[in-house]
Regions:
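Acidic-and-aromatic substrate-binding clefts and catalytic sites of carbohydrate-active enzymes
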Residues: 6-11
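A cross-domain feature marking catalytic cores of carbohydrate-active enzymes
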Residues: 2-4, 33
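Auxiliary Fe-S-binding modules of radical SAM enzymes
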Residues: 12-128
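Short, contiguous strand/loop micro-motifs
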Residues: 4-5, 81
């Protein structure tokens, strides 16, 4: 998992992270764009201003461009990857790097072979 991807701050490291992961034996990879729910938004702003004040406005402009003009998008289907040209570009870079490294060729299939139905119907099972 490459996360969080922060535009104009660490998105340039996607390929290097995936390369290191592939060399370590990883077969599947995914990414998540930076998410800024209310609980962390102000903390991230303070950290960014303290550590990268010259990039603050640019990074937040890109984040808002990928989040429909807001700092955070909670919508299913867009909250992890974002929307718009920059989100598309980050997604394509990730996909191309995965293809070059042979990642995500085959997704593991979920199996129910080891699932066993509870023996007692209607009663709560014991914890011990």
């Amino acid at each position: 998992m490459v996360a969080p991807v922060i535009p104009a701050l660490n998105d340039s490291e996607i390929e290097r992270i995936l390369d290191a992961a592939a060399h370590a034996g990883v077969k599947e990879a995914s990414y998540v764009l930076l998410r800024l729910p209310l609980e962390v938004r102000d903390l991230f702003r303070e950290w960014l201003m303290a550590n990268y004040p010259d990039r603050y406005r640019h990074i937040f402009t890109l984040i808002r461009d990928m989040r429909g003009g807001r700092d955070y998008d909670s919508q299913w289907g867009t909250r992890m990857k974002g929307t718009g040209p920059m989100a598309w570009m980050i997604g394509r870079r990730f996909e191309i790097a995965c293809e070059k490294l042979g990642l995500n060729k085959r997704r593991s299939k979920l199996t129910t072979d080891h699932f066993a139905r509870p023996k007692r119907s209607g009663q709560q099972l014991s914890l011990f």
